[in-house]
């Protein structure tokens, strides 16, 4: 089911692997057997806070609003330091902006947009504490586990488009014009439009890339996924996922 101007909510029961399409504001959600995220939405009891991990607990020591050399950007591990603060505010759902790698070619600004996904199957190295012995997956899992200890559910954002970098390495994922050039959606010059296909014929390559993202989120133990601008993809795409 597509949510007008927003997205879709998909609940995935890990035991049966059955897909249930359900309405919810702004996203697509995967829930395990003990996950109550769907009921929170349906009962209007979800107190949601959106965070960009890259800046959420960044250490801007000199206060110039730039993470200079020697200053730590926000990451999975230092974000844990602020979870008690989030809990004390009565927040029970964290909407985490995209954690996928950020494209650098044609990037907007110096850091690039987190919605310009360089791929859909790995974790943004900017969000990883280089001083930790834990892997990127382990660090992400630790953050989510610490959220769960505080009764905070975690929704991870799924970008709607791919970065220009991804177009260069995987052109089969994208729509092309008559000159075989990529298509820029609206004025988002750092991303290119994915070729998801139609309700009658989906693009299996794009579908497989998104399924890899779903598998990553399930591996991390997150409670849900918000699908950004979900209505630009055919409804059959979300049903298939």
Model-assigned labels for residue ranges:
Residues 1-10:
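Short, Lys/Arg-enriched N-terminal segments with co-localized hydrophobic residues
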Residues 18-26:
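Bacterial N-terminal signal peptides
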Residues 34-47, 52-92, 98-220, 241:
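Substrate-binding/active-site clefts of carbohydrate-active enzymes
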Residues 155, 224-230:
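Short catalytic-loop micro-motif centered on adjacent basic/acidic residues
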Residues 166, 230-238:
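Acidic-and-aromatic substrate-binding clefts and catalytic sites of carbohydrate-active enzymes
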């Amino acid at each position: 089911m597509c949510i007008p101007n927003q997205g879709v909510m998909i609940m995935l029961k890990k035991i049966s692997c059955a897909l249930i399409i359900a309405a919810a504001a702004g996203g697509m959600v995967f829930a395990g057997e003990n996950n109550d995220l769907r009921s929170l939405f349906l009962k209007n009891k979800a107190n949601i806070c959106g965070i960009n991990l890259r800046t959420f607990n960044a250490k801007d020591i000199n206060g110039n609003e730039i993470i200079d050399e020697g200053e730590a950007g926000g990451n999975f591990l230092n974000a844990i330091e602020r979870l008690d603060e989030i809990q004390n505010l009565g927040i029970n759902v964290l909407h985490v902006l995209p954690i996928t790698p950020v494209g650098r070619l044609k990037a907007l600004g110096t850091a690039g947009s987190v919605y310009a996904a360089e791929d859909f199957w790995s974790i943004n190295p900017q969000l990883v504490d280089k001083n930790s012995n834990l892997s990127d997956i382990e660090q992400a899992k630790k953050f989510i586990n610490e959220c769960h200890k505080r009764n905070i559910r975690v929704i991870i954002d799924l970008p709607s488009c791919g970065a220009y970098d991804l177009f260069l390495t995987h052109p089969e994922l994208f729509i092309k014009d008559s000159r075989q050039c990529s298509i820029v959606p609206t004025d988002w010059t750092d991303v290119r439009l994915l070729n998801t296909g139609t309700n009658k014929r989906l693009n299996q390559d794009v579908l497989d890339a998104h399924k890899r993202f779903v598998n990553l989120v399930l591996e991390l133990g997150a409670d849900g996924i918000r699908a950004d601008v979900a209505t630009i993809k055919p409804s059959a795409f979300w049903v298939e996922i």
